[in-house]
């Protein structure tokens, strides 16, 4: 065998081993991969998932962020099923070796509701990062483990280690949301709502999206004070309403930690998040202005405009912010439930001054604006 033939044979063998690795990973949807078998000499040569056992190892990448992703998965489940599960403990997770990764998390969650059938369950949650340096995540799997009726996996979308759109269905979301661009799709949705197969606010969301909507594309700018006073467009939450939900503060923490990952690198950093104080929250949805506020809170498509303070030194790409914990800051978060039940969050910090990119090679004696002590550039 010539050198070229040996090289081709080795490449083909590596390809087959790589393909077989992901075939084995697919059997558990990427969650239980500890027993995947590789041929001798192939360990370290296969690009696959890295496994972290959080019960045995206290040091793992981005501990704060991973737990927020786990909470986000439970939030998706609660939003669809009407439950109140909370994170009890992160047991293990698998992730890709990429800047933007997919996280396959196994966790314990408990439902504080006394009427709940079981106080604690094991959950599996998959979260895919869709952007780096800002909030852009998608959750397509959030389900109790070992519950057959909830482990139905759609065959419409094959297992893909990392994706930027579309969801691998997990059977939690019963029925599909039509795209609502055609009359037939809209009529089908209206029929599903009339039969109580889907909540009414889903129809409101769809009608708004059909009319053009605002829950696509780039995030909006922060609205003016006059616009926020428009009660038909915005609903200003009462303090008791946003305090009664733990997920609004989770949205804010996700915006901050995905923008500045240094906060998530050590277990000591959560003190930054503990100082956050929400001042007010406005919601923009597709639901009617006369709908009860709790319906707006459950809307599958919504913008959340969060005013807060307590973050001394915000960091965001190519932005400069005023420094000080006393400064009131702004964050926008978009929540969208996809037509297969995947939940997406996009978010950003507002209020910073954008700066232009400059050459790294400064002229002799020229001082970089990044060195000024009064401001901090993300």
From Swiss-Prot:
Signal peptide: none annotated. InterPro entries: MS5. Pfam families: protein_MS5 (PF04776). This is UPF0725 protein At1g23970. Belongs to the UPF0725 (EMB2204) family. It comes from Arabidopsis thaliana. NCBIfam families: A_thl_para_3677. It comes from the Eukaryota.
